[in-house]
């Protein structure tokens, strides 16, 4: 009956949990940093903090350059708006002018490969369609920093390979990339360094082959 007494008394005994403990991390311009760890290790929290979609309770973050982040599935989309409308909204939020959005719109739609669904509300999209459009937007707004959280694990194999090739193009162009994946093959092929998180803390930072 302890749980009942807690509810009735209005004095529940909750334990404070730190999703991410103090982290000191420098990422160089043009570097590709992998983020690995088990589920619940703090990977997504770290990327959200770096993308500034989540404010840290303590500490400081310094980011230089436009950031494009592909985090929670469809988090940046308005569900009632069409894919077309969400492209313009997402790009405008990133600071692109109407003319700049017009110039990349065709490339975004072509890369996403969702056909006539671009004119339908995104609430009707499958998870694969969400990530196709979100990835296409994130990689066509010319960011200096690209943050990707498990995006390539959603959708079909052909689009995953196409997306990975697109990320490699970013790497070859000298863009800074933070890449979270459970695929060590992708991490080893793409990343210059890897940060290994465990229980919200950095366990090790080193090269992917270590």
Model-derived regions, located:
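Conserved ABC ATPase "signature" region
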Residues: 2-8, 88, 100-117, 134-136
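Pre-NBD coupling/linker segments of ABC/ABC-like ATPases
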Residues: 1-21, 208-210
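The feature captures the beta-strand-to-loop junction immediately N-terminal to the Walker
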Residues: 36-38
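Conserved ABC ATPase "signature" C-loop
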Residues: 199-200
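Conserved H-loop
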Residues: 183-189
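Conserved catalytic segment of ABC-fold P-loop ATPases
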Residues: 189-196
